[in-house]
């Protein structure tokens, strides 16, 4: 994410402030309060995002708990508990794959704030990479300390404007089939929840960053409704997998463990017949 946006100075200042916050120590209550105090979105949206964060926390807790022998059953229970609040939970089926890059405000955040976009996607990469690392640790001792490796790579990615060349910040949205394939193999539903949450977060930031939008609240509510709807499966599973993998492992932040020194893809998602033509008006 080395490109410059129109608000580079503001982005750099914001990243410095965010890094200071991230290095602090916070309780679970502090984290939940941060969602409630968010003035950018309404209470319903905050609750959806908070519930998603708690699901991700519960999922990681299952995999690091040595006393839980049947991880798959525990994950299935966590998924069922998460879905127990239908209004504030996203679907466990893939939504329309190209919605991320074809909705009217698509790429708004990445275009206006490329450094912060990479910052957000790096956070999402860590969610998936940490889960993949701890699952691998449970499967094979050769992957011991994988979570520490993933965490070190995370700090390398956000330690500078563009990240280190060996472990650059993601230039594509990280998705479970690419970054956490073992999670996807063990629980497609859990992986889909995380991917739907991360896509929704990206869509929300696109809407918030897009200039001269008068109905941001309505657009965000519509996006949340789309992702929390359980009535229809908007895309086929294979289309979802193709979309996830077309982003490339390297471009999505690289593997949690192991090495991948360059992109294994020669085209991005947007270049593979997934191009969104965005015309942004002058920022106010």
List the predicted regions and their residue ranges.
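Polar/charged low-complexity regulatory segments
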Residues: 1-284
